[in-house]
Amino acid sequence: MSRGLGDVYKRQVITGLTVVLPNGDIINTGSRTKKTSAGYNLTNLFIGSEGTLGIITEVQLRLSPIPESIMAAVCHFPTLEKAVQTAQQVIQYGVPIARIEMLNKDQMGISINYSKLKDVEAVPTLFFEFHGSEQSNNENIKVVEEISKENSGSSFKWAKDLEDRNKLWKARWDVYYSVKALINNGRVYSTDVCLPISNITECVNYAEEQAKKFGLRAPMVGHLGDGNFLSLIHI
């Protein structure tokens, strides 16, 4: 189970492709079998090429069942280091979790103002999502809450109903639009960096320093499950 955005990574759910090559030839990649040793792994090659090796016209996907229960939680932290450390420990302890998202202090403040959020602090914040049975989700939430508290986490809240889950994640869902609303005729450019989660804190701190150095405002959102974070730069 992915700890980034969704149940599994894209490469894991794509089983085959139909691709039009530059010379006009049409090829099919992949296999219906779970394993194959016949030839090169062209499916992953074309996924990683981002359209430079051929135009993908059809995609074969492996479907997953809808989880019996989906729950969400949020937790505030005094520092970015504490938030990242919590995510690291949740993953290291093998807690089954579908998503771990992070907003830095600046982005939380922007989201709070834009979405008129109450009882939410402008501090580094983690957003969790759990998939599974209701019993397993309840157990995993307790584990994550305990890990969060050990890392100085506060205001831990969780919900299971869709409306309540959306309220908890409101600051996360409105990231792009909240940043866009800060500028009139300018644009928002998104960077996309992926690195070992142990290096996230150092990299984010450096990115924040560079943004200040050049007079830019660049709030950040992180997909900590896969060590990915984005800076939303105002131009």
Predicted regions and their residues:
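Structural signature of FAD isoalloxazine-binding scaffolds in flavoprotein oxidoreductases
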Residues: 6-23, 55-58, 123
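Short, conserved aromatic-histidine micro-motifs
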Residues: 17-31, 69-86
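Residue-level structural signal for beta-strand termini and adjacent loop
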Residues: 31-32, 59
